[in-house]
């Protein structure tokens, strides 16, 4: 039996998700940041920021050659090149804790791991499940599509 309150629950869940992600979709192209914004990018552990979003982070947002993890200027590196998804998970968890400790900052997560590292949004987005309810983390549309 199909009950109308099931329809309402489905609608409310969708509406809640829409409210949750409102204003929290990372722009597909970022060439400038507000003072409190941080560009979150996929890196390698060696911190060789030579291509993709890592190169943008180095050239424009303060990423430091030789530093593959964490806050650097107005950027935050999450290593994605060292192996499978499970090797990325602890760095994403560390990032989420950092973001939680810094509510004054707004983190713009790029589609980390989905460029040079070769993963799909379906692989990486679930790692950001806990970020869904954090108002100071924006996620790429492709990640929202997976975790909503």
Where are these regions (language model features)?
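Acidic, Ala/Val/Gly-enriched low-complexity intrinsically disordered segments
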Residues: 5-7
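Macrodomain-like recognition of ADP-ribose-binding/processing modules
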Residues: 9-148
């Amino acid at each position: 039996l199909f009950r109308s309150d099931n329809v309402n629950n489905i609608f409310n869940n969708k509406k809640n998700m829409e409210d949750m992600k409102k204003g929290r979709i990372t722009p597909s192209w970022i060439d400038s940041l507000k003072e409190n914004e941080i560009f979150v990018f996929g890196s390698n552990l060696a911190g060789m920021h030579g291509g993709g979003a890592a190169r943008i982070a180095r050239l424009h947002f303060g990423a430091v050659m030789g530093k593959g993890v964490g806050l650097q200027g107005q950027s935050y590196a999450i290593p994605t090149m060292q192996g499978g998804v499970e090797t990325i998970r602890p760095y994403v968890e560390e990032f989420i804790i950092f973001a939680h400790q810094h509510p004054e900052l707004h983190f713009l997560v790029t589609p980390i791991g989905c460029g040079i590292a070769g993963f799909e949004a379906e692989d990486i987005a679930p790692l950001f499940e806990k970020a869904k309810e954090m108002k100071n983390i924006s996620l790429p549309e492709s990640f929202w599509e997976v975790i909503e």
